[in-house]
Amino acid sequence: MNTPPELIAFTGFDSWNDYENEIYAIYLETVVNANLLFLNTPVKVRFRPTTKDKAFGFWHLISEAADQNNKDEDDRLPDLKRCERIRWVAWCITNAHQVGFLYWENQRGRETHVVIWAEHLDFVVILAKRKTDLDEKYYLLKTAYCLREHTKRKLRKEYESFHTSKKG
């Protein structure tokens, strides 16, 4: 597995606002404007509704809901581990087929998602399969986060189940 991009630590910045602006600029460069592809299919991001003049999708990469039942975007809390790893999102998408990565599909409600797991780094990126009105396929970047132990076990079972069902 190749080496992940360098983490962007908060410690080198004078304020949270400076840090947030820097990681947003990196998000725009490495994700939004990078023409990312996953399995030769474009990866797009959600912009609306914006929060604090930044794209909706950005917040789902760098923050988490304090309460899973609260869908108010303004109440999301920054997660420094997610923030530090903003460069890892594009890196995971473009390297998903390499050794050290696992990927598979799962169902979440009516949506088909793709989970990309940088296994030895315990970091996942979630994409949703979508189509345009003209039936053109694309992936929507949903979120990315560091795994906790209980989630690793759950994802391992899900991965094994997906690949077992593909063989049968």
Question: What feature does the model see in each segment?
Answer:
Residues 1-168:
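Ribonuclease/tRNase effector modules and their secretory precursors
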